[in-house]
From Swiss-Prot:
Belongs to the orthopoxvirus OPG209 protein family. It comes from the Viruses. This is Protein OPG209. Gene3D superfamilies: 2.60.240.20. It holds the Pfam family CrmD_SECRET. It comes from Vaccinia virus (strain Western Reserve) (VACV). The gene is OPG209. InterPro entries: Orthopox_C13, Poxvirus_TNF-rcpt-II_C. Keywords: Early protein. Coiled coil: none annotated.
Amino acid sequence: MMIYGLIACLIFVTSSIASPLYIPVIPPISEDKSFNSVEVLVSLFRDDQKDYTVTSQFNNYTIDTKDWTIGVLSTPDGLDIPLTNITYWSRFTIGRALFKSESEDIFQKKMSILGVSIECKKSSTLLTFLTVRKMTRVFNKFPDMAYYRGDCLKAVYVTMTYKNTKTGETDYTYLSNGGLPAYYRNGVDG
């Protein structure tokens, strides 16, 4: 009986190795269901950085300060539209980082995903995946994601906006780690 089981197992293994694996092929996305404008806005609460450096390499974009690093990355064959306009500014203890690009003739024709990482320079084991607060599903793309590592910031917000400038269709994802402290939610007087 044991030999019959071994033979059946051997036949199953060899037949599954000999047969090709089914790998689904995703067809190109039509221009009316694709986007040609990308904007990633990261807002940081309790931040007043003045000096920063920008690095972009192989669909990975970073803004680096003395306290934290923000990274926006895409899948290896991902974003066809490079994020060329990258800037940071701080006002009233809220810092904002903007990664943006728009093209008249380049449309995102394949499935892609954008990920955002906000990491404090001070060593920490705290890791928070930001919660999706609002999201629309207009274009064919994978869901966006973001995480925050550390405790150098009180609140982190990420808004990813995709737009087709010819049709006017807009798709966005809004993520956060919880929100503003009660002092700011309730107003100065409480």
